[in-house]
Amino acid sequence: MKKILYDNQMFTFQRFGGVTRYFADLMYNLPAGEFVADIPMRYCENHYVTETYGHKYETISFPKNYRIKRRIYAFVNNHISKFAAKYNDYDIFHPTYFSPYFLKTVKKRQKPFVLTIHDMTFERYPQDVLIYDRTIPHKKRLIAEADHIIAVSENTKRDIVELLGTDPSKISVVHHGYRPIAAASDKLFDRYVLYVGERKGYKNFLPWLSAIRPIFNLDPGLKIVCTGSPFTHAEQKLFARWNISDRLLHISANDAQMASLYRHALCFVFPSHYEGFGIPILEAFHNGCPVCLSNASCFPEVAGDAAMFFNPNDAQSMQDTLKEILASSTLREELRRKGALRSKDFSLERMVEQTCNVYRKL
């Protein structure tokens, strides 16, 4: 039986998020009898570990601010991870983020390590990286040192090879798998387009919103429902200047509400210039939501023929594509049907099995 040692990095940092959902789904679904997962840490408030899979860790009640608590958790958990890398019995090490703290230890112990790369966003958009953030150099170092790399899409693999000159034979593509999160709650809004996640820079939200403004004049009841961070003051001022403040709604949605938002939306729109994979696409497919995507990055690879595509640099293309979806219930039903079929290509079982194939070769 192979023992896989995972570390605490992202489980300490994130309470919710795609990276920790990926690792939790992987660790707790490894085939019994062949692999066993070890994730040594004392403190954890990550939703997928503690709620989805029911593994309880200690927490502290004070301070209330999670950013401050996270520093305490990281201080303790990082010492535990260092000790585990140095002394625990394991066959393969699989870090959850890019701190290189373990490198000397695993090399000295001759333990192979696998690195998952979810995207190359920082490398593609370095202007968005804080000056003191060490992610780019740490990530580059780990990619060079890793025994094998898992990329979550062919697009991400191409980026690693192009940007860092990595040997492509060292990289396996393992697409994300989707695990249904929750049953849908009641319908929350009427007649809306759904936008999920961050809205900054390369996400292309404001250029897309500007492009589709004429549609509001044609469809007086249409709303744009956004999840993710609340609207900033600058965004609110812009919405007011465009006279569309009443068309933009924000919700901090739980899992059941997210399922409902997808299920009742006219369509889900993802205008981003770049993503590593795009988990919301699978969420939309699974919940019967028509999908409207940028034709950039990994989106054609993930969605295939189950989505409508637009040019994210062309305002008319963005507007016309949304108009077409909103105007045709027949088209929306066809996209729902194709999305349901496409979602079967991205099962959790398939993701786990392909990852285990990487482990088996080491």
Map each language-model feature to its residues.
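Carbohydrate transferase catalytic cores enriched for Leloir-type hexosyltransferases
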Residues: M1-L362
